[in-house]
Amino acid sequence: MASLYDNEAKIKQAIIMLQKIVNDTSVPRNIRRAATDAIRNLQDSSLSPAVRAANAIGILEEISQDPNMPTHTRISIWNVVSMLETVKD
């Protein structure tokens, strides 16, 4: 059960990091929208933590290729993806 709590803690930390991106007005709107979608996926309690993380990773990896993304935002997204990749069932 400790693993479940670790996974939930990682997901909560990822949500906090993504909320910072959503609230940053220097980030283009489409990237903020993708971060909001990733947060929504992470908060979907009907799915297991690993599935929620995988869904969010898919959204974030797709948007991380956007050439309009500020460098600091890209690094934050990579950090979130790295954290979510460690979430396992």
Swiss-Prot record:
Pfam families: UPF0147 (PF03685). It comes from the Archaea. SUPFAM superfamilies: Ta0600-like (SSF158436). Coiled coil: none annotated. Belongs to the UPF0147 family. HAMAP family: UPF0147 (MF_00342). This is UPF0147 protein STK_04605. It comes from Sulfurisphaera tokodaii (strain DSM 16993 / JCM 10545 / NBRC 100140 / 7).
